[in-house]
Amino acid sequence: MGNLLIEPVSMIVLTGGPCSGKSSSLAHLTEKLSDHGFMVFVIPETATLITNNGIDRRKMYKRKQIVLFEEAIFDMQLAFEETYKRTVTKIFPGKKKVILLDRGIMDVKAFVSRDDFNAILRKRGLNEVGLRDRYNGVIHLVTAADGAIEFYSGENNSARLETPEEALRFDHGIRESWLGHPHFKIIDNRTDFEGKIKRAFAAISQILNIPTFVEKNDRFLVKDVDYKKLPVHQNIQISEIYLRAKDRKEQVRIRKRGQNGSYLYFLTRKKINKENESYIEEEELITEQEFHTLKNLIDPKTTVVEKERICFLWNNQYFELDSYKGTNEGITILEAKHVPTFISIKKNITGDPKYSTRNMARKKTLNDKMLDC
């Protein structure tokens, strides 16, 4: 099986609507990550690359032309990603490496119909879950047309075609294309641009385990949800299994995560420092076979945690609503800074160890069940 925790190179997507500050952010983020000991590699925006070299979308008027254009972006993007990752892994072994991508493969979904995107996947024998979730993180920078309209322009990108209204529409479409990714962060325009970059770096730091201040969400026990008012969303099925650990300061778990019959598998090791209540979390993609082998090492004091996660966007925020199954049936938990109007809360459970995933995995006694009633 090998050392499952050695990640040869991390891939982080920087996406967003037109004029969101992606290109301007890349230089700053590259410098900051380099300061923290990472070798940083940047994959430029494929659409801009081919548009600036003659394949101009402004000359395309038919749906078939647009689909072929997006297919070209899809294939080039995938080739860039695989080539970069394979090459830097071989050339720079043993180094901390991160690839920053100016857009990722799922951005294509925002510019074609659902049927056309599914056809692109079928022709290549690919599935959406595998493509979306293989990145370590996705950072969505909101277009300046949403909250900073005075800064919306095409000066930094000659390939930019969109009006502010179109930019808003594309921005929302791109966000929805990434719904369901396990590490998806939205960076809005509530601060100046310098503050926006700092928040983007903080989000990346959290993904890469770089010590930094992170504004944490509260956790709420949900009383009721008006599902008729739920915005566009993705339903994700998650199974988590805690394994036997050699050290009490360490938690090891495996996770099955996916939808529509397609799944990815992860192994996570969480190292806890009880003195300052901090922790470092390492996560690695594993194969389905490795998952089934490792699940035989389940901690005998625990059971499998099953939940359905609903991922949705509301007021420029990304939400994950977890409804638990099995021994935790009836428990629904929301992590958020601000609670959507269509969700009613039973109580704030921030910091309550009873509702930690580790504790919810514990096998329940008859007394536990009576207390939950």
Model segments located where?
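Conserved lysine of the Walker
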Residues: 22
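Hydrophobic anchor at the beta1->P-loop junction of P-loop NTPases
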Residues: 14
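Conserved substrate/cofactor phosphate-moiety recognition/catalytic segment
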Residues: 30-76
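A glycine- and Lys/Arg-enriched "phosphate-lid" helix/loop adjacent to the NTP-binding pocket
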Residues: 111, 115-176
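Phosphate-end processing signature that detects enzymes handling 5′-triphosphorylated RNA
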Residues: 194-195, 201-373
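NTP-dependent small-molecule kinase module
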Residues: 2-5, 166, 172-224
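Glycine-rich phosphate-binding loop used to anchor ATP phosphates in small-molecule kinases
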Residues: 71-132
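Hydrophobic positions on the alpha1 helix immediately C-terminal to the Walker A/P-loop
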Residues: 25
